[in-house]
């Protein structure tokens, strides 16, 4: 959600900025822009509505020269998508890019208008530009002006500021929205995501909450909000950006669906030893903390919330630990009672999800036993701020609709369940069954992917549909939720998911020949109950699409399509049955002609409320 790239060097930086923006496209955006300043203080700004490629074409037509620059991809919050609202925003010689939301932008706007400033956009960002300009007019350096301006802003933001009169310096401020400095040789960089800077550096400083950074070609100085200098450690990143080529695939999402067997293998690598789960990466004190856990509270948003919902069944049935799962944006704004010895687990692909981070920070005040992050991005805010962390190791996920990040989150959660069951002294067969299932999972998914053509053919039935209903029971109910989310995200078909036992409590009224009903049906103890629910739909003329275990005993008919799945171990069934629902959503979206990798109005990483 929005992207920032900045650079200060002796060479022209426009192409560095553009490449950084290309690497941030996956986050979602509606417009893009950049501004560069040369050594004489001449500033050139380009902005375009639409894709980064349109901005790059404009830069070819109007070459940009200058060693200092900032660039941005915008996801509209205040003001419609337009070139006028695209960043960077300018106030005379002050140039600003900004991620986040300035909550008090309206009173600041009125105060600045009263001082004679004219606004040319609808954005909250332009307020920052004029405010810094005003403070600079009161005297002092750009850093001093920024230090006076920042306390006047309320909200979550990350901003980078440039003064065309002094092109030897960039100023940056972080409050709730991530910023990372990239360290070079005689040149330095800044971005909202380290992925943007991997072509130019592997050394990074992650700014912490409240940090204000002054960046020149040869130095980086960091201050707190009072102006006192603080030290931040620089780290060497081994993060790989492996998504530049879609290869044989049409979309990143398709590629990432097919990468799941290898992604899960990577998640398991080094974590299973002698038939047991080995999470020694958590550190020497982790076992002591985990052995005290009497309750688990999970916070997440979107797809990560659905993975938390699945794991609740596992934690309670396999490890005997009560577990609650809550949407992070709800948790942070209500008064909650903390259970004794409760472990806070946060789930996020990016590690920068604003509501999840806020929930984690709140949990530190509420007296939780400890915190554990499950994340795909090493060095992210969620990882740095948690007591313990487990990486999913899924590799870079570019498609906005999450696929391999979801299945690898579930893989890590299931390993954690095995670890806790052992620490609780439960029957060793629990861990044995989990390990056996996880080791078999990659090959099981490869088997399932061979059914792609069958699912593609079924997708034709959805081309004229406007609604769909997903059903599941037990730990397959959250998989139904995830299937509905995928379909609505990328095909724009309204989809809902219900626990199948809830059919008679409302959803049955929706059933007719135009309502496709998608069911996940592994061969487990709830199968007979699920078959009764399926018959309720069938009797009312509903069109059924049942993803069923090959041994489940279903017989197809005109209004019931059976997609047979290979039998899988019960413990891994939720992960396995996710994949055909991903493929269904993908093929329906293809038929409908939507933007699969960057669906409308959505962003990969939601870094604002």
Curated annotation (Swiss-Prot):
One of its GO terms (cellular component) is cytosol. Residues 286-426, 458-599 form the SIS domain. PROSITE patterns: GATASE_TYPE_2, SIS. Keywords: Aminotransferase, Cytoplasm, Glutamine amidotransferase, Repeat, Transferase. Residues 2-218 form the Glutamine amidotransferase type-2 domain. GO terms for biological process: carbohydrate metabolic process; fructose 6-phosphate metabolic process; protein N-linked glycosylation; UDP-N-acetylglucosamine metabolic process. It is found in: Cytoplasm. GO terms for molecular function: carbohydrate derivative binding; glutamine-fructose-6-phosphate transaminase (isomerizing) activity. Its EC number is 2.6.1.16. Its main location: cytoplasm. It catalyses: D-fructose 6-phosphate + L-glutamine = D-glucosamine 6-phosphate + L-glutamate. The active site is at residues 2, 604. Catalyzes the first step in hexosamine metabolism, converting fructose-6P into glucosamine-6P using glutamine as a nitrogen source. Homodimer. PANTHER family: GLUCOSAMINE--FRUCTOSE-6-PHOSPHATE AMINOTRANSFERASE, ISOMERIZING, GLUTAMINE--FRUCTOSE-6-PHOSPHATE TRANSAMINASE (ISOMERIZING). This is Glutamine--fructose-6-phosphate aminotransferase [isomerizing]. It comes from Escherichia coli O6:H1 (strain CFT073 / ATCC 700928 / UPEC). The lineage of its organism: Bacteria, Pseudomonadati, Pseudomonadota, Gammaproteobacteria, Enterobacterales.
